[in-house]
Amino acid sequence: MNIHEYQAKEILRKYGVPTSTGVVVTKTESINAAIDELNTKVYVVKAQIHAGGRGKAGGVKVVKSKEEAKKVAHDMFGINLVTHQTGPQGQKVNRLYIESGCDILKEYYFSVVFDRSASCITFIASTEGGVDIEEVAEKTPEKIIKFSVDPATGLQNFHAQGIAYELGFKDHQVKQMKEIVKATYKAFIETDAAQIEINPLIVNKEGNLLALDAKFTFDDNGLFKHPEIMALRDQDEEDPLETRAADAGLSYVKMDGSIGCMVNGAGLAMATMDIIKLYGATPANFLDVGGGADRERVKEALKIILSDKEVKGILVNIFGGIMRCDIIAEGIIAAAKDIGIKVPLVVRLAGTNVEKGKEILSNSGLEIIPAHDLADAASKIVEAI
């Protein structure tokens, strides 16, 4: 789960990380009063969306008068902001964060992530802040600094000190950076975060460190322990189909293709999407119904797939272990009768009660295209659309 910048900064401040502050606007009628309350020389108007690249897309504006700040804020509120992370459809701006501007002497990048490949928490930092870290990693990888934390020992003083020295800090800035590293690590652990990113982390004209922008991504599996974090969720920033799927206990991610996929197991789902690409088409979604799905969940999964108007065909690929193939077959038939499936439907079943499942489908009277293996299924659905 992601949260907005202003929410991320509020959490960081609770842990002792110095951040820039401002006022949040959630409706146009509040804009003028918010700017009057701020009453500063330089205003920074920021669109609050769950996507990066706001600055380049016009979602961050710096102005030097109250009147101009009000105009910029009114113009920005409610627009559809398109960045390299939103895709061409963009994201509607329903919230603004308006801050006082500050003089920047130097910008840095700092983040803490869970590195799955190394099975540990890793700090990533760079002297090249204020830009996409992916761009820095691609063009000048030598400017990326990484420190991994052994989960058996946790964060040690040498980690924090090493980061401070590698970034070139001196004197009181070393102490400030060490405190930021320790505070961010504590926030990461205690909130069950998957990533905390501060970009940029700046040195202001007084020579002090300040988080100018912040991003949190939380591990969804840990959210049940944090109702206070769940309360920060903004469903307007989420795909409605993904939200609907999550409420039904389904793992669904919308994509840009035309072939809907319903699979049990994340690995099999990835393999199914790969083979669809291999046969020349593009998947419309990732959808894992899970091992314990019942007839109603299968029916809901197909309804969600068909809610995507770009779907021109559906491939169901089920390996029955805990999941029984006859239950899948009954769910498919129930969905077809309930909502009507007007696009080609290819079904590949294997495993527990597979023959019973195939019999149920063949006796249903529905136009279902059977497939005996994954390659056959991919070939048939691509040909059918």
UniProtKB/Swiss-Prot annotation:
GO biological process, one term: succinyl-CoA metabolic process
List of residues binding Mg(2+): 199, 213
Residues binding ATP, per UniProt: 46, 53-55, 99, 102, 107
Cofactor(s) listed in the protein's UniProt record: Mg(2+)
Transmembrane region(s): none
SUPFAM superfamilies, A to Z: Glutathione synthetase ATP-binding domain-like, Succinyl-CoA synthetase domains
GO MF term list: ATP binding; magnesium ion binding; succinate-CoA ligase (ADP-forming) activity; succinate-CoA ligase (GDP-forming) activity
Keywords: ATP-binding, Ligase, Magnesium, Metal-binding, Nucleotide-binding, Tricarboxylic acid cycle
Protein EC: 6.2.1.5
Domain ATP-grasp: 9-244
GO cellular component, one term: cytosol
Record's cofactor remark: Binds 1 Mg(2+) ion per subunit.
Keyword field contains Cell wall biogenesis/degradation: no
Reaction(s) this enzyme catalyzes, per UniProt: succinate + ATP + CoA = succinyl-CoA + ADP + phosphate; GTP + succinate + CoA = succinyl-CoA + GDP + phosphate
Highest taxon listed in the record's lineage: Bacteria
Annotated positions binding substrate: 264, 321-323
Assembly mode: Heterotetramer of two alpha and two beta subunits.
PANTHER family: SUCCINATE--COA LIGASE [GDP-FORMING] SUBUNIT BETA, MITOCHONDRIAL (PTHR11815:SF10), SUCCINYL-COA SYNTHETASE BETA CHAIN (PTHR11815)
Function, in words: Succinyl-CoA synthetase functions in the citric acid cycle (TCA), coupling the hydrolysis of succinyl-CoA to the synthesis of either ATP or GTP and thus represents the only step of substrate-level phosphorylation in the TCA. The beta subunit provides nucleotide specificity of the enzyme and binds the substrate succinate, while the binding sites for coenzyme A and phosphate are found in the alpha subunit.
Entry-linked NCBIfam families: PRK00696.1 (NF001913), sucCoAbeta (TIGR01016)
Family: Belongs to the succinate/malate CoA ligase beta subunit family.
Name this protein carries in UniProt: Succinate--CoA ligase [ADP-forming] subunit beta
Species in which this protein is naturally found: Rickettsia bellii (strain RML369-C)
Taxonomic path: Bacteria, Pseudomonadati, Pseudomonadota, Alphaproteobacteria, Rickettsiales
Name of encoding gene: sucC
